[in-house]
């Protein structure tokens, strides 16, 4: 018998897209699902849309938060009430292919995977274009070791490193959420969290296929104007990630290079915004000095 799968959808003011999003979930070829819509204090008509879907289909459950708590809190709330053996997360402005859950779950059945990772393509509202990372000849199904996963998360990889960082288009065994929660109150919560599921998983399978449409919106949180908290958050997130991987006995050399490249980018951004007198700027400069001093000692500069 097929297992129940919980689909958690965090929602904030996405009424413009929400109907299309939920309709595509309801049309999944894998039907043994529950859909948990978490209205994170929306001020548009998102809450009403959620309630209407709940009245139409008994697989839909709705949670309303009175005040906006953030995407991470909304995800955690939905996960906390999920009844499924596996959980997948869908952003409320995105679209899932009708066979996504079936395709991911097939690998659970065939390979007894704790985590199954898909891939996605982009629709950019600013230019009206679709961007694909996977073509026909790129399709593959791979069982991946944790070291390879972390290298692909961090590296300039031939597929799409974001596929391993975003929490969407995946199936994750529910029991892993007993140990891992999304980090609320800062940006890059996905970057801070997803590697922990991989570190705990006994088996991870990757399907390199376009299973999910990710919508890039001009008003989304990751496309808004830079502020100083971005620099604080990225340093905190990568410090945590590197620490976790060191404790797990992994080689962090690829992750270290990615961290340094991000520090360089943020150093330039802070200089552009004339924020060189800040503690954040000084901290980034200190960390870069540690890296370049080590490279010089090792004869790599």
Curated annotation (Swiss-Prot):
InterPro entries: Glyco_trans_2-like, Nucleotide-diphossugar_trans. Involved in the polymorphic O-glycosylation of the serine-rich repeat protein PsrP. Catalyzes the third step in glycosylation PsrP in this bacteria. Transfers glucose from UDP-glucose to the terminal glucose moiety of already-glycosylated PsrP (using truncated substrates with PsrP SSR1-GlcNAc-Glc). Has a marked preference for PsrP substrate that has already been modified by GlcNAc and glucose. In vitro has hydrolytic activity against UDP-glucose and to a lesser extent against UDP-galactose. Also catalyzes the fourth step in glycosylation of the serine-rich repeat protein PsrP in this bacteria. Can transfer the sugar from UDP-glucose (and much less well from UDP-galactose) to the terminal sugar moiety of PsrP-GlcNAc-Glc-Gal or of PsrP-GlcNAc-Glc-Glc. Transmembrane segments: none annotated. The keyword Glycosyltransferase applies. Pathway: Protein modification; protein glycosylation. Encoded in RD10, a pathogenicity island with an atypical GC content that is associated with invasive pneumococcal disease. Pathogenicity islands account for greater than half the genomic diversity observed between isolates. The main function of this island seems to be correct synthesis and export of pneumococcal serine-rich repeat protein PsrP. Gene3D superfamilies: Spore Coat Polysaccharide Biosynthesis Protein SpsA, Chain A. The keyword ATP-binding does not apply. This is Glycosyltransferase GlyG. SUPFAM superfamilies: Nucleotide-diphospho-sugar transferases. GO terms for molecular function: glycosyltransferase activity. Belongs to the glycosyltransferase 2 family. GO terms for biological process: protein glycosylation. Keywords: Glycosyltransferase, Transferase. PANTHER family: GLYCOSYLTRANSFERASE, GLYCOSYLTRANSFERASE EPSH-RELATED.
